[in-house]
C-alpha cells in the first residue's frame, strides 16, 4: 500500500517548520529485534563493523528500539523503532555536538538533518561555539554550575545541555508520534543537575547522552497486531522513496 500524505500540506514557511508527514501500514512484526536484524541484512539501516576484525558482524547504528510490556502478563504492548534518523546529538559535559546524518543510501548530510541544525542554531545562537558543514557544536551551562541553593525544579527547568533536545522536540509535526527524540542517558549525566564528586575516567566511553532526531519510525501495536511506518521530512520525494 502506498504511503499517505497528512492533511496539512507544506506551506511557504521555512522547511524545518513544515515537514510532510507520510504513513504506511505494514505487515505486523512480532519481534522488533528480529526485524532490525532483517533490515540490517537487507541494507535498509545504517551499519558499521569493527575495521580491526575481518570477521566482525555488521551491526546497525543510528537507530533506536523501544519496547513496552504488560507488567503482569509480560505480554508485549507497543514497539517503537527509529529506523532512520535525521540528526545525532551527543553530549559530553557542557558540550553538545549535533550532526546531520547522511541518507542511508545517499551522499552528504540529508535535508532533514540540516533543517534540524538550522533550528538549533536559530534557537540557541548565542551558545554555538563551532560550526562546519553538517555539524554544530554548542556549549551550554549546567545548573549544577550555578547557585547550589536552587530548588530541584529550578535546576531541572533551567537552561542546560538538555535544551537542544527540547528545541527539536517542540518542532511542529502533524502526527501524534512525531517529533521523537530517543536515545540514552549515562548515569553521570546526573552531574548536570547535581554537584557530584569527581570520578576518574574509566574504560567506558559512553557520552553523557546520545540521542537521535527521528525521520522514519515504526509503531507496532501488539494487542491489535497492527504496524505503521511514520515518516516526516522536508524532502517529500525522498521520504516517499524510503518508505
Where on the chain are the PLM-derived regions?
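Signature of the chorismate-utilizing enzyme
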Residues: 1-243
Amino acid at each position: 500500500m502506498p504511503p499517505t500524505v497528512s492533511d496539512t500540506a507544506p506551506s511557504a514557511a521555512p522547511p524545518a517548520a513544515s515537514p510532510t508527514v507520510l504513513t504506511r501500514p505494514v505487515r505486523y512484526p512480532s519481534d522488533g529485534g528480529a526485524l532490525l536484524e532483517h533490515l540490517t541484512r537487507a541494507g535498509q539501516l545504517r551499519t558499521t563493523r569493527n575495521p580491526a576484525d575481518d570477521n566482525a558482524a555488521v551491526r546497525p547504528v543510528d537507530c533506536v528500539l523501544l519496547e513496552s510490556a504488560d507488567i503482569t502478563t509480560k505480554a508485549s504492548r507497543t514497539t517503537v523503532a527509529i529506523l532512520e534518523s535525521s540528526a545525532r546529538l551527543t553530549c559530553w559535559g557542557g558540550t553538545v555536538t549535533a550532526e546531520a546524518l547522511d541518507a542511508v543510501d545517499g551522499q552528504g548530510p540529508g535535508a532533514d538533518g540540516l533543517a534540524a541544525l538550522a533550528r538549533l542554531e536559530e534557537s540557541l545562537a548565542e551558545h554555538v561555539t563551532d560550526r562546519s558543514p553538517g555539524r554544530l557544536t554548542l556549549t551550554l551551562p549546567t545548573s549544577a554550575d550555578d547557585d547550589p541553593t536552587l530548588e530541584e525544579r529550578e535546576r531541572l527547568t533551567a537552561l542546560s545541555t538538555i535544551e537542544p533536545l527540547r528545541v527539536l522536540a517542540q518542532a511542529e509535526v502533524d502526527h501524534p508520534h512525531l517529533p521523537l527524540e530517543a536515545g540514552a542517558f549515562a548515569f553521570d549525566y546526573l552531574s548536570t543537575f547535581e554537584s557530584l564528586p569527581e570520578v576518574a575516567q574509566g574504560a567506558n566511553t559512553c557520552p553523557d547522552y546520545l540521542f537521535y532526531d527521528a525521520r522514519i519510525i515504526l509503531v507496532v501495536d501488539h494487542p491489535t497486531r497492527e504496524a505503521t511506518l511514520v515518516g516526516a521530512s522536508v524532502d517529500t520525494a525522498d521520504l516517499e522513496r524510503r518508505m
